[in-house]
UniProtKB/Swiss-Prot annotation:
Residues bound to substrate: K147, D179, T216, K217, F218, E219
Catalytic activity: guanosine(46) in tRNA + S-adenosyl-L-methionine = N(7)-methylguanosine(46) in tRNA + S-adenosyl-L-homocysteine
Protein known as: tRNA (guanine-N(7)-)-methyltransferase
E.C. number: 2.1.1.33
PANTHER family from the UniProt entry: 3-DEOXY-D-MANNO-OCTULOSONIC-ACID TRANSFERASE/TRNA GUANINE-N 7 - -METHYLTRANSFERASE (PTHR23417), PENTACOTRIPEPTIDE-REPEAT REGION OF PRORP DOMAIN-CONTAINING PROTEIN (PTHR23417:SF14)
Entry keyword S-adenosyl-L-methionine: yes
Family indicated by similarity: Belongs to the class I-like SAM-binding methyltransferase superfamily. TrmB family.
Active site: D143
Organism: Shewanella baltica (strain OS223)
Organism lineage: Bacteria, Pseudomonadati, Pseudomonadota, Gammaproteobacteria, Alteromonadales
Enzyme's top EC category: transferase
Coiled coil regions in record: none
Disulfide bonds: none
Statement: the UniProt record of this protein carries the keyword Nucleotidyltransferase: no
Length: 238
């Protein structure tokens, strides 16, 4: 069991301090997850270091790089890497069984263009990712912290938007998705106010699910039950 921290922001989105977001219970690794970590980490795992990655060294080539924050069990991330072999993918996840599951699926799929961090995403972004190096940042279904008193814990805040903008190259895209409509409205408000971005939606709101984001089983079930999912895509223009 380990403590996971997140940032706290004031009402203007100014960073205040790190606070404990939740206590992560690692859960038991399945035999397959443990074996995948042991066998695949040397080739697909990235050990955190507070110095920026040289992506061409990590992947052995120059290519657009997509980074996903909090990939869960990793099925969608592996599918994206498989569907776009011309791109590089980096996933960050603090839940160890999710890391094991992702590595297992990646090995089975035979993908070679995926690397994984088991670390705090804010630290990785701040220190291990060079400014202007990413073609896309993905944040899919983050915790909505739906109670008003917990809104300060939401990851999409003004300073976070600025951090992502710095890491994107000009023309790069910050892609968010949520199944909580009120959080999508919060995301839209934050991103519309963030300098250096342009909303890719034709009507200035949300976009249809793009082809590059796979439809998850959870999401497909939600559609059948009439639940919505909202995608937002903002391009770095400055």
């Amino acid at each position: 069991m380990s403590e996971v921290t997140t940032a706290e922001f004031n009402e203007e989105g100014k960073y205040l301090r790190k606070i404990r977001s939740f206590v992560l219970r690692e859960g038991r690794l399945t035999k397959g997850q443990a074996q995948a970590i042991e066998s695949q980490w040397p080739t697909m795992g990235l050990d955190y270091s507070p110095t920026p990655l040289v992506l061409s060294d990590v992947f052995g080539r120059e290519a657009d790089t997509v980074l996903e924050i909090g990939f869960g069990m990793g099925a969608s991330l592996v599918q994206m890497a498989k569907d776009a072999p011309e791109q590089n993918f980096i996933g960050i996840e603090v839940h160890k069984p999710g890391v094991g599951s992702c590595l297992s699926d990646a090995a089975i799929a035979g993908v070679t263009n995926l690397r994984v961090y088991h670390h705090d995403a804010m630290e990785v972004l701040e220190h291990a990712i060079a400014d202007g190096s990413l073609a896309r940042v993905q944040l899919f279904f983050p915790d909505p912290w739906h109670k008003k008193r917990h809104h300060k814990r939401r990851i999409v805040q003004a300073e976070f938007a600025e951090l992502i903008r710095r890491k994107l190259k000009i023309g790069g895209v910050f892609h968010m998705a949520t199944d909580w409509e009120e959080y999508s409205e919060h995301m839209l408000e934050v991103m519309q106010a963030a300098p250096g971005y342009k909303n890719q939606s034709s009507d200035g709101t949300v976009v249809p699910r793009p082809d590059h984001r796979p439809l998850t089983k959870f999401e497909a079930r939600g559609h059948r039950l009439g639940h919505g999912v909202w995608d937002l895509m903002f391009e770095r223009i400055a």
